[in-house]
């Protein structure tokens, strides 16, 4: 069976190479499939998720209502957290598809698709050693890595290895692996399906870095190189319009460190025409900043540059704090199940491709290799600098590591494709792959146990008290346990049969099955428990609110901005329940509202001190009540 399977794979590779057009068609179908699963499937089937997503969605809606595309507003106040690009894209989607969840999330999904395609393209052309695996010029039985810039053979980079008859199959393999890994993991899955700005930032920043490498790797093709560098500058400008200074600071640090290490800083910066590029970036990004500062003055400068940039790096903002290793844990969890192989992939990336005799991270060897062989090293700098930058930052938040995920996917794809070559062609199975496989099997077992027991842990959120019961009744805990249990069994079989180079397939199929049969149904249940009651309350508000009647919510420290989006009304959020009665007494007397609408839980409603005869219950949904409080009775 083992022989027939290997023969089938080999015949498939040969067919793949004989029909390059078919290879492209199949690859495009592969990209569309994984992108559909990761980003577009049931994209608008659930409501906006409090607290962050409705902030973006409503600010974009306000732009379509007011026609002010310069200053973002939310709930009657300016919102200076982020630059405008995400709002602009959402607003355009609203005008095309209507104001709904699908339109709010479409920019994230499209940029997720674009980033996945960009990773695929880069790996397709530069993801195998020097781009011509097995087509060495050193004669039968050996591989030579040729320095394309000097056209000389560095003798100390000569390694003996069986010649692989062709190279194209590995280029397609590593590209397909990388595309799957960059799209199918928890962190990209979340941000690619929600209306945050983080997926847009990751796509702009990641696309810019990949465009830089595509230009860097082709010095002999001047026109092509210039186009990729132009693309780099445009995407940097878009990254700035998405997140601000970090959109240029992080790529700048990554590229500077990489070029200094390979000793090509002056040479490459000259090729990039840095001054012209800086002018392009400024021309695209600076006008909006000038306009928003001109319109809002010091308030914008203090809020955006001071609070949301400088203070986030130097102090804790919004109580988002954590230990120095916080982002290591986020990578481990957020990039699962692929993250188990990252230590081995990072070590592999530090060694020039297929050079068994060289020392890890030996700079001289990298400097003598052709540029097109540097993708793994570039991804390594990308990964480590983003991780280090946000580990140093005092404010810790789980979205900050998203821009390093494309680099992690590239590192893992290079490593896995190398292991498949070793196992399938050379029948070699190194210790790092066996150890990674063993740890992966343990992870599968842990996930199976966690899925089975999770209903017992899901009753602590007061906004979703019945979540654990609903998950159990739907059978999702058992389904999840079966999926990961079967994955553990399959991984064990591969380990015992010395076929661990195919474990990536088990991870892929396991994660896709978990996405289809557990994550998607569970997201619907979570929405019905957590967000649907708020949408029902919002619908009631729209139906019963009288002209001039104020709308309040007792937030208890957790505001629900989705109420603003779904009611399309201004909502006053109160942290202290006792503030409700005093608010009504002190409200603008000129308006003289006879009553106000109050949204609260039964517990927080009691804490307001209001007697039952002072309010009228209009409706109840989930844990929330909508009541009308009489001003006359309170006074």
Residue ranges, per PLM feature:
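Membrane-integral, polyisoprenol-dependent glycosyltransferases
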Residues: 1-429, 454, 564, 620-623
